């Protein structure tokens, strides 16, 4: 049985997302989109008994106020947004039965930055290029291509769901209220355009997340980069500035160096361009980016490709039924 959720207040930027997002269209310029903190999102779907690909809501910084038309089971994971159900505290990381007519109200994120709401049965919006994920900049996917707006109605595929299920404490991402984050990076693909002392400076320095950051890119503020000789002695086709290079594809998670400004290219980033990418943040570390806030400090730890793959397998191993009690 289908049900509707009425959007009383949309929140700061609440969007429909699904896992793993819109893959297979990178060469056409469509990024994967999908949940920024995939770990928290996947656990929310498991809690309510949804399929892994079921669509849910990503709530950024300040969550929405939603009224449910019918009985359902919901779960809220990720950032702590001090949510209430009809005025009573709503538990995080737990599946909860909601009765028709009840209202879920969220506040500002007090710990972390993004929370995820799963509803039994999953949110029903049209698939675009194989996914329901919202790609804001192109107006693709989600509910009418954009973040939720006050007064809209969200369709849900009604599902039974089981209330009273909790994610085990040691199976959740460790979202803290501190301002310091250790972020893993893989060196490359354009690390040879940076001098060795420049690479060491990057790894040994603190980098501040700027307020001008979103699901397209995370702008960082820190010391100046030191370029290798090849960055200055290159051919004219590569561009004038040492950070310029002949247009090429960008890996998701690459740290794109635009002049002296590093920008981490995340879920909704461009697929190609003419700037170098000396490091790449692996997907298994994206949950840390998703849960950090402007002015937080990053320190980067270099890992190998094999270590990054092992990190991803570790998260995959926690996004399973055995993580529920």
Language-model segments: which ranges?
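Conserved "landmark" site that anchors the functional core of diverse proteins
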Residues: 1-325
């Amino acid at each position: 049985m289908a049900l509707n959720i009425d959007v009383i207040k949309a929140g700061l930027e609440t969007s429909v997302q699904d896992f793993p997002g819109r893959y297979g269209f990178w060469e056409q310029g469509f990024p994967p989109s999908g949940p920024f903190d995939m770990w928290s999102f996947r656990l929310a779907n498991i809690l309510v008994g949804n399929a892994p690909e079921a669509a849910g809501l990503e709530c950024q910084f300040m969550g929405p106020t939603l009224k449910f038309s019918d009985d359902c089971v919901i779960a809220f994971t990720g950032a702590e947004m001090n949510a209430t159900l009809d005025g009573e505290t709503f538990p995080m990381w737990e599946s909860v039965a909601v009765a028709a007519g009840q209202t879920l109200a969220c506040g500002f994120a007090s710990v972390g930055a993004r929370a995820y709401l799963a509803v039994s049965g999953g949110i029903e919006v049209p698939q675009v290029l194989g996914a329901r994920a919202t790609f804001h900049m192109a107006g693709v996917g989600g509910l009418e291509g954009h973040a939720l707006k006050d007064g809209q109605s969200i369709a849900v595929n009604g599902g039974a769901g089981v209330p009273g299920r909790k994610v085990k404490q040691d199976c959740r991402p460790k979202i803290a209220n501190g301002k310091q984050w250790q972020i893993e990076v893989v060196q490359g693909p354009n690390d040879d355009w940076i001098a060795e002392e420049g690479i060491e400076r990057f790894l040994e320095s603190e980098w501040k997340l700027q307020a001008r950051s979103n699901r397209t890119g995370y702008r960082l503020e820190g010391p100046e980069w030191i370029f290798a000789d090849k960055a200055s002695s290159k051919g004219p086709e590569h561009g004038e500035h040492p950070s310029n290079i002949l247009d090429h594809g960008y890996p998701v998670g690459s740290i794109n160096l635009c002049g002296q400004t590093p920008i981490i290219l995340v879920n909704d980033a461009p697929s190609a361009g003419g700037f170098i990418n000396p490091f790449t943040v692996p997907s298994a570390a994206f949950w840390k980016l998703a849960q950090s806030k402007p002015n937080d400090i990053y320190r980067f730890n270099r890992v190998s490709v094999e270590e990054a793959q092992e990190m991803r397998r570790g998260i995959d191993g926690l996004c399973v039924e055995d993580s529920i009690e």
